[in-house]
Amino acid sequence: AASAGGGARSADDIIAKHCNACHGAGVLGAPKIGDTAAWKERADHQGGLDGILAKAISGINAMPPKGTCADCSDDELREAIQKMSGL
């Protein structure tokens, strides 16, 4: 899913490099990749996908801002969240 500029990373690349360490195993309460019910519960409490994205950008609990992907765009983070969550 490259942007018009061709520089965007794929959601899979971002997940593998920045998200999988915690979301792959559910470390420290992180919702696991593919556990749509866990992600939906969070979405319901945080204002949907936009709410989850906002928390991902600012950081939440043990998760640092942008989940260690400081140079990820909001769109890249949204795509990674959608891919991990199934939402």
Swiss-Prot record:
InterPro entries linked to this entry: Cyt_c-like_dom, Cyt_c-like_dom_sf, Cyt_CIE
Pfam families: Cytochrome_CBB3
Disulphide linkage map: 69-72
Gene Ontology molecular functions: electron transfer activity; heme binding; iron ion binding
Alphabetized UniProt keyword annotations: Disulfide bond, Electron transport, Heme, Iron, Metal-binding, Transport
Domain of life: Bacteria
Residues bound to heme: 19, 22-23, 63
Keyword Metal-binding: yes
Record note on modification: Binds 1 heme group per subunit.
The keyword Transport is annotated on this UniProt entry: yes
Membrane-spanning parts: none
Function: It is unreactive with cytochrome c reductase or oxidase but seems to function as an intermediate in nitrate respiration of facultative anaerobic pseudmonads.
Family per record: Belongs to the cytochrome c family.
Quaternary context: Homodimer.
Protein name (Swiss-Prot/TrEMBL): Cytochrome c5
